[in-house]
């Protein structure tokens, strides 16, 4: 995961001081890309421990189309707590847009099912895309989508994915985002009888919060360790039938975790 550490250093070296919605302040760069060959290992940051339970359960929650944090709480995941209302609702965030994008005539489009069908029946299509950025519903969302748009690509029997992330919290959020989409690529590839290819991450406003600087320097002082391997223990009937127990990360030997405040 040297690419990730190099991005951190780039933000420190080249970033512009900017104000932000949270009032915390950031160092920010605009436009950055990283490529991870998923054949080389699972891209889970090793210079600090990442909470894999949260990453897996959040992705399963998205795939169910859920937008209430009750499922997350049942599984001891609290990463969405700060944005939920008193009933645990977040509005039409990722899960709603992925699974039930509303159309003007009252229908709902299941984008995940659509891209699975495309991958199986028209893998050379240049339209194998999922978007969470629904302009008509942004004002109803507790938090506008940060990882907003992703595209799948099939070549030589391998499935690749590129994500566009409009806003990226490099220290806290990005390790989650990379691992989450890498996991999704593995799941989609298994469902489509493909091998995994590359995960390409593209960032817009890519920033370090001003209250994450000490943590960033600590992480940069650490040497990356070998990437772990993802094992999927079974192939469910559909992309929506995976369970937490289906996934195992083998050989994950990270440095200790580093705590940092969340900018809300």
Curated annotation (Swiss-Prot):
Query: Protein name, please?
Result: Thymidylate synthase
Pathway where it operates: Pyrimidine metabolism; dTTP biosynthesis
Family classification = Belongs to the thymidylate synthase family. Bacterial-type ThyA subfamily.
Is the Disulfide bond keyword given for this protein? no
List the keywords (alphabetical): Cytoplasm, Formylation, Methyltransferase, Nucleotide biosynthesis, Repressor, RNA-binding, Transferase, Translation regulation
Entry function? Catalyzes the reductive methylation of 2'-deoxyuridine-5'-monophosphate (dUMP) to 2'-deoxythymidine-5'-monophosphate (dTMP) while utilizing 5,10-methylenetetrahydrofolate (mTHF) as the methyl donor and reductant in the reaction, yielding dihydrofolate (DHF) as a by-product. This enzymatic reaction provides an intracellular de novo source of dTMP, an essential precursor for DNA biosynthesis. This protein also binds to its mRNA thus repressing its own translation.
Give the domain of life: Bacteria
Q: What is the effect of changing residue 177 to A?
A: Shows 200-fold decrease in catalytic activity, 20-fold decrease in affinity for dUMP, and 10-fold decrease in affinity for mTHF
Identify which top EC class this enzyme belongs to: transferase
Record's comment on post-translational modification:
Although not discussed in the published references, Met-1 is represented in the submitted PDB entries as being modified by either a formyl, or a carboxyl group. The N-terminal is probably N-(dihydroxymethyl)methionine, the hydrated form of N-formylmethionine.
* Location in the cell: Cytoplasm
Please give an example of a GO cellular component term from this record.
cytosol
List its EC numbers. 2.1.1.45
Q: Tell me which residues bind (6R)-5,10-methylene-5,6,7,8-tetrahydrofolate.
A: 51, 169, 263
The GO annotation for biological process reads: dTMP biosynthetic process; dTTP biosynthetic process; methylation; regulation of translation; response to radiation
Source species of the chain: Escherichia coli (strain K12)
Organism taxonomic ancestry: Bacteria, Pseudomonadati, Pseudomonadota, Gammaproteobacteria, Enterobacterales
């Amino acid at each position: 995961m040297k690419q990730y550490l190099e991005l951190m250093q780039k933000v420190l070296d080249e970033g512009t001081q900017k104000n932000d919605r949270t009032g915390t302040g950031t160092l920010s760069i605009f436009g950055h890309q990283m490529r991870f060959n998923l054949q080389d290992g699972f891209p889970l940051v090793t210079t600090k421990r990442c909470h894999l339970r949260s990453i897996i359960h959040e992705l399963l929650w998205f795939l169910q189309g859920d937008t209430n944090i009750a499922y997350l709480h049942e599984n001891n995941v609290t990463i969405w707590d700060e944005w939920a209302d008193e009933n645990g609702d977040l509005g039409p965030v990722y899960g709603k847009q992925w699974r039930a994008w509303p159309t003007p005539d009252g229908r709902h489009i299941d984008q995940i099912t659509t891209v699975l069908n495309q991958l199986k029946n028209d893998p050379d299509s240049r339209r194998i895309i999922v978007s969470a950025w629904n302009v008509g519903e942004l004002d109803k969302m507790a938090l506008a989508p940060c990882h907003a748009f992703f595209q799948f690509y099939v070549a030589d029997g391998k499935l690749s994915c590129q994500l566009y992330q409009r806003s990226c919290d490099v220290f806290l959020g990005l390790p989650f985002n990379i691992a989450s989409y890498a996991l999704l690529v593995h799941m989609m590839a298994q469902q489509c009888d493909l091998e995994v290819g590359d995960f390409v991450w593209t960032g817009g406003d890519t920033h370090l919060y001003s209250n994450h600087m000490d943590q960033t320097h600590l992480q940069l002082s650490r040497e990356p360790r070998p990437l772990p391997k993802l094992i999927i223990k079974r192939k469910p009937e559909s992309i929506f039938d995976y369970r937490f127990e289906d996934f195992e990360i083998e050989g994950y030997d990270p440095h200790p975790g580093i705590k940092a405040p969340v900018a809300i």
